[in-house]
């Protein structure tokens, strides 16, 4: 079960003090490397090193900060023997990305045709 983040620990939601869940989620997902980490964990658990490699050598400090954010939000968990993986909630979130991924593929093909 995801931990509830105390109001004092939450980072400000960009441009809003509403505290609405959608704004908090968009703020979390808008942080550097958050979406990429979720995407790279879509098929399997990865160690910190493998995840860093998959994320184009992201800074270890930033990567660990994002992993901490995503763990605290309940999207990622650390399994000692295998590394980081998506939780069930993280997999649910990933499912919401798939239509956008399919659209991005169509958009890419449409905009590269000459």
Residue ranges and their predicted role:
Residues 15-62, 73-75, 84-91:
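N-terminal helix-turn-helix DNA-binding core of bacterial DNA-binding proteins
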Residues 68-113:
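Charged, amphipathic alpha-helical coiled-coil/dimerization segments
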